[in-house]
């Protein structure tokens, strides 16, 4: 994108004209800030790292959608921080691993828990980078994917039945409720119940953590909230 094109966009958004020379200076300063951000030292340990992506429009000759990968960390003391973001043509587990390996080179030493949307193969790639970290699949994405596979008239009931599972007060209760859910729907929606059985080892990791923070660690909503802004 040329400086003139950027200038036109800025004028449309903010109603103020900037010359191509001024835009050039601003973009150069911004590039320096971005490089500084992606080379900064990481000195803290993180209780939770959320990993997810969102597709945005990118112009490379022509305009197309690319996957903006985002890692957000919560420190042991509760501070929230965007650890890294990178643009890739498509979302891939390998991309997240590469981002984490870069953070490790810059000092990232310890992560207690990863929370992700459950992209196929991502758990294994995260374990390669941080073998001791726990892993949680995002319940919001689990429910969203399930509701795409069921009839409209069943969606409300299924949503309520799943809520009973992930909002249970203890892990054994959640596992019992999951078993009841699977038994209830296994004949009508076998693909749904089989998909839950395939990932059940990653559904209840949040019960290993204090009750006060469980609601914030069984989904990647924190990243989706950032993306809305």
Say what each PLM segment does.
Residues 120, 164, 168-229:
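Acidic/histidine-rich catalytic cores and adjacent linkers
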Residues 4, 21, 113, 141, ...:
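Short, solvent-exposed positions on alpha-helices
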Residues 45, 153-170:
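A polyampholytic, Gly/Pro-enriched intrinsically disordered region
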Residues 8, 22, 137-139:
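Alpha-helical oligomerization/assembly modules used to build nucleoprotein complexes
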Residues 10, 126-127, 185:
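Broad structural signal for hydrophobic residues in well-ordered alpha-helices, predominantly aliphatic
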Residues 2-15:
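DNA-recognition alpha helix
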Residues 113-120, 125-161:
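Conserved beta-strand -> loop -> alpha-helix junction used to position metal-binding or nucleic-acid-contacting
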Residues 16, 20, 25-115, 120, ...:
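RNase H-like nuclease fold core
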């Amino acid at each position: 994108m040329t400086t003139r094109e950027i200038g036109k966009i800025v004028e449309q958004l903010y109603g103020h004209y900037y010359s191509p020379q001024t835009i050039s200076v601003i973009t150069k300063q911004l590039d320096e800030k971005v490089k500084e951000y992606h080379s900064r030292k990481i000195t803290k340990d993180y209780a939770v790292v959320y990993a997810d992506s969102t597709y945005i429009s990118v112009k490379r000759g022509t305009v197309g959608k690319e996957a903006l990968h985002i890692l957000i960390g919560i420190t042991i003391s509760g501070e929230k921080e965007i650890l890294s973001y990178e643009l890739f043509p498509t979302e891939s587990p390998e991309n997240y691993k590469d981002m984490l390996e870069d953070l490790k080179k810059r000092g990232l030493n310890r992560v207690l828990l990863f929370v992700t949307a459950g992209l196929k193969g991502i758990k294994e790639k995260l374990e390669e980078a941080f073998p001791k970290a726990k892993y949680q699949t995002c319940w919001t994405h689990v429910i969203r994917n399930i509701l795409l596979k069921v009839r409209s008239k069943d969606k409300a009931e299924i949503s309520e039945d799943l809520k009973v599972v992930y909002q249970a007060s203890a892990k054994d209760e959640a596992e019992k409720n999951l078993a009841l859910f699977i038994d209830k729907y296994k004949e009508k929606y076998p693909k749904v119940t089989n998909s839950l059985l395939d990932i059940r080892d990653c559904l209840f990791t949040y019960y290993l953590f204090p009750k006060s923070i469980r609601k914030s660690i069984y989904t990647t909503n924190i990243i989706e909230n950032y993306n809305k802004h």
